[in-house]
Amino acid sequence: MNRILEAIPFETERSLIRLLREDDIDWYIKTINKPFFNEFVDIKACEKYNDIIKEKLLRLIRNWMERTHPQTEIRTVVSFGGELAGGLTVFRTGNGVYDLGYWVVPAYQGRGIGLEILRGITTLARGYNLGVRELQLTIQKDNERSIRIAKKAGYRLIGQYEGIRTTNFVYRYTIDKKGR
């Protein structure tokens, strides 16, 4: 995970993906409390937990900077045209397996940014010796846009499970030993 952390920030065709900073936290929390975000996640953010979320994010940022704790989670923001337009999370779940989550705020949806984010992190994982074997996405069955994006980025459906609120599909991208 530390090798992935060191590879960020990175640029896609039109966006910059960089680590979440302290000055982004208020925007980040406000954004994840909006209806568009909660529509397609299997848990529901709740404003009463904002202080807990803020403290967790601050602790995460300090851990990245100090590099004193094993990293299991990376949160980034996506800048498009100099404005914050979304986010990408990377969670280490096993030996070389990483769960991804990405989102784009409504004002920037429909511009191909989600596909850029997913292709960008996939290219990064393939192109460097980062110890990544598989990237995985969990997508609610009704999130047709994200399903299309996953398929366009080369992810394959490998299974499904019943989540808290809906059926979730699991898509995976496997990186071979040559980084493809």
Annotate each language-model stretch with its function.
Residues N38-R62:
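Conserved GNAT-fold acetyl-CoA-binding loop/helix
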Residues I29, Y49-I53, P70:
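Generic, well-ordered alpha-helical segments
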Residues M1-E39, R75-R180:
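Acyl-donor (CoA/ACP) binding surface of acyl/acetyltransferases
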Residues R59-T76, G86:
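A short helix-loop-beta-strand connector motif used in the catalytic cores of GNAT acetyltransferases and
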